[in-house]
């Protein structure tokens, strides 16, 4: 079902101008934390413009929210429903600092996942059962009836049971060997996926592996309990911290976290002599009125980001002088899947990674998207940049299209978008 957006109403007027300024401030702050190459002195973002072309939005599914959206991010007892309804306050400096730390840890985790081949934008992986437990073939998606892999019955896909969605993580194994939505895909089955061994046999095998030699390389050896303990310690250290945005408040960073876990982390996975550096993750109780919508978003418009880069010249001596280069980033296009969840006065928004995007909308959409020129799920298919050095006054020469600078800026824009907006990172708004 297609959704018409009044793009002019959303992006113009006082609210639209204020939102554009917040986005400019956010991108500028991100560039200040980037390690610059030797030939660049600094980057300053000047303006951000939404443009006049609206994205195409198509509703694909209505289901239960992702488990991460239920995480209780309050440090005190203010996580009750009554406090949720009356909460208007912004984050403290300590909470913002904690959120920044979590974002950095999540970025490192995303780099490791990409290095291991679990997230490939240009060549999305085929969904076979070679990865344990992994995503299965999309051919049987209608029979399985997953809220993300298609349904065979009318009505609301995925049903109204939040608990089946939430409790599925206990039977989904450890998230290091599967995509975030793979566990969700098998949540409705009593024993998980049909070809999945029983959890008791799996845990027994893991215990036996702990007594074997660890001489294999990291890419070949199985997942042994010491490695699982390391993952659990990392998950414990990643203390949840919400980033919220009221209608009239300032924007904060997105929430970033590890894979979905149960309400507490088993104590047997931690070392006896080591205490966790932060309390275990807490989750709110799901309610029947909680709702999540899955959208396919296509965009090829004229969003514009203007910034200045100072280039250092090494003649006649190193870093002799800096020359400002004006860059205009435009022509952005992407085709991806977005998730918007509404839970107790909070709206959670994020995009899905390519492998999760294919799982969310099914095999038919995958084939249809591939024939349209852009690969669905591969966010930011194209970004164009225009660069100029010098002035056009009085017949002076102008140097255009500085290759290295353009490449660096485009890489950073793509990295910021994927790190901050792609699940498991997500944004939370107070509504």
UniProtKB/Swiss-Prot annotation:
Comp. bias (Basic and acidic residues): 97-113
Annotated Pfam families: MMM1 (PF10296)
Residue intervals of the SMP-LTD domain: 1-431
Residue numbers spanned by region Disordered: 68-153, 209-289
GO CC list: endoplasmic reticulum membrane; ERMES complex
UniProt keyword list: Endoplasmic reticulum, Lipid transport, Lipid-binding, Membrane, Mitochondrion, Mitochondrion outer membrane, Transport
Bias type Polar residues, positions: 115-129
Membrane-topology annotation of the record: Peripheral membrane protein
One GO BP annotation of this record: phospholipid transport
Comp. bias (Acidic residues): 69-96
GO molecular function: lipid binding
Localization per Swiss-Prot or TrEMBL: Mitochondrion outer membrane; Endoplasmic reticulum membrane
Bias (Low complexity): 241-252
Subunit note: Component of the ER-mitochondria encounter structure (ERMES) or MDM complex, composed of mmm1, mdm10, mdm12 and mdm34. A mmm1 homodimer associates with one molecule of mdm12 on each side in a pairwise head-to-tail manner, and the SMP-LTD domains of mmm1 and mdm12 generate a continuous hydrophobic tunnel for phospholipid trafficking.
Family of this protein: Belongs to the MDM12 family.
Domain notes: The SMP-LTD domain is a barrel-like domain that can bind various types of glycerophospholipids in its interior and mediate their transfer between two adjacent bilayers.
PANTHER family: MITOCHONDRIAL DISTRIBUTION AND MORPHOLOGY PROTEIN 12 (PTHR28204:SF1)
HAMAP family: Mdm12
Protein name as annotated: Mitochondrial distribution and morphology protein 12
Species annotation: Sclerotinia sclerotiorum (strain ATCC 18683 / 1980 / Ss-1) (White mold)
